[in-house]
């Protein structure tokens, strides 16, 4: 460990570290804006920035395959799903004053306390540990595919069954039953049917 | 690269997501904060896998495999979660988690605003099962 510490300058960051730090700052800022902004659609768009920044961090850590999967699934699919969810629940465009609940100060206390504890422990534990980023990429598609289909085949297949079950469950949950639909049609004209419109 | 950089970034992202889960009121915003927490865990897994693939003799690349599994499970989670939120919004007319207190102990319904949709939902359920 001391040898490793001696061969790396502690306070002389390499170019990769500087890039990681800058992208990390952008990612963290976007994440903070995601959880603090009062405009719901803006929160989803800041989430895109945060997830894209994380994809760049994966690229800097030489995990290429994970980075592209992150771009495809998170930035591509999950954010679109969230935007559709916001639209379907008739989220207000513009500032909504009740985006934060009343216990935000307790939440802030908990978050800051856990952040301080985690950062302290992590920095203390891995003070003298370096990642060697030279040489072949640790997460290229060939390496990831080989390990996934040699050592992780059974969890992989189980996960595909889980995805199928989740899809069927989502369809069943979001399908309207006949009685509910008839009920909604019958009271669509009354003010109670449109109660939750603007909130 | 110093291992503390990705570890600290992931710890901070996790705590940001934790704040969002605790402080947000809209259910979809809570789901977005959960996504942030899952991504923080993914960053940790990838960083430690890259470190171990150099430091250890033999490695299963378990970090990257688990990251892929986490991403798939997060996709399933957001699908199911949004379906539940949409169903709640259809029944109650709100996706405000502070107002969904039917199973809470010691909380009377605040007023007619929360009372009426609840009884409406009960009637709707009875109608749907009949």
Curated annotation (Swiss-Prot), chain B:
Residues 97-110 have a biased composition (Basic and acidic residues). It catalyses: a quinone + NADH + 5 H(+)(in) = a quinol + NAD(+) + 4 H(+)(out). It is found in: Cell membrane. It is an enzyme of class 7 (translocase). Coiled coil: none annotated. Residues 97-130 are annotated as: Disordered. Keywords: Cell membrane, Membrane, NAD, Quinone, Translocase, Transmembrane, Transmembrane helix, Transport. The chain crosses the membrane at residues 3-23, 28-48, 68-88. Pfam families: Oxidored_q2 (PF00420). One of its GO terms (molecular function) is NADH:ubiquinone reductase (non-electrogenic) activity. Its EC number is 7.1.1.-. NDH-1 shuttles electrons from NADH, via FMN and iron-sulfur (Fe-S) centers, to quinones in the respiratory chain. The immediate electron acceptor for the enzyme in this species is believed to be a menaquinone. Couples the redox reaction to proton translocation (for every two electrons transferred, four hydrogen ions are translocated across the cytoplasmic membrane), and thus conserves the redox energy in a proton gradient. Belongs to the complex I subunit 4L family. This is NADH-quinone oxidoreductase subunit K 1. It comes from Streptomyces coelicolor (strain ATCC BAA-471 / A3(2) / M145).
């Amino acid at each position: 460990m001391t040898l490793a510490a001696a061969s790396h300058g502690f306070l002389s960051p390499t170019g990769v570290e500087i890039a990681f730090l800058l992208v990390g700052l952008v990612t963290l800022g976007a994440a903070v804006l995601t959880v603090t902004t009062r405009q719901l659609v803006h929160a989803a768009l800041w989430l895109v920035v945060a997830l894209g920044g994380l994809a760049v961090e994966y690229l800097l850590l030489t995990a290429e395959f994970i980075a592209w999967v992150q771009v495809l699934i998170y930035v591509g699919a999950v954010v679109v799903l969230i935007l559709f969810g916001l639209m379907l629940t008739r989220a207000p465009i513009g500032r909504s004053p009740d985006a934060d609940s009343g216990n935000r100060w307790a939440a802030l206390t908990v978050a800051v306390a856990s952040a301080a504890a985690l950062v302290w422990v992590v920095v203390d534990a891995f003070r003298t540990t370096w990642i060697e980023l030279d040489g072949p990429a640790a997460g290229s598609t060939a390496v990831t595919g080989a390990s996934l289909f040699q050592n992780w085949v059974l969890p992989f297949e189980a996960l595909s069954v889980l995805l199928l079950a989740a899809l069927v469950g989502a369809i069943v949950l979001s399908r309207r039953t006949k009685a509910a639909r008839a009920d909604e049609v019958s009271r669509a004209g009354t003010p109670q049917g449109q109660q939750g419109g603007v909130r | 690269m110093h291992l503390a950089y990705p570890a600290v970034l992931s710890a901070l992202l996790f705590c940001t997501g934790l704040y969002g889960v605790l402080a947000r009121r809209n259910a979809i915003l809570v789901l977005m904060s959960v996504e942030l927490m899952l991504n923080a865990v993914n960053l940790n897994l990838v960083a430690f896998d890259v470190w171990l693939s150099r430091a250890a003799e033999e490695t299963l690349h378990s970090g990257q495999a688990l990251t892929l599994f986490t991403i798939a499970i997060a996709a399933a989670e957001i699908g199911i979660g949004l379906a539940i939120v949409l169903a709640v919004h259809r029944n109650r007319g709100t996706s405000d988690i502070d107002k969904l207190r039917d199973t809470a102990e010691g909380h009377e319904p605040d007023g007619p605003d929360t009372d009426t949709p609840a009884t409406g939902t009960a009637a709707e359920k009875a109608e749907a099962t009949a």
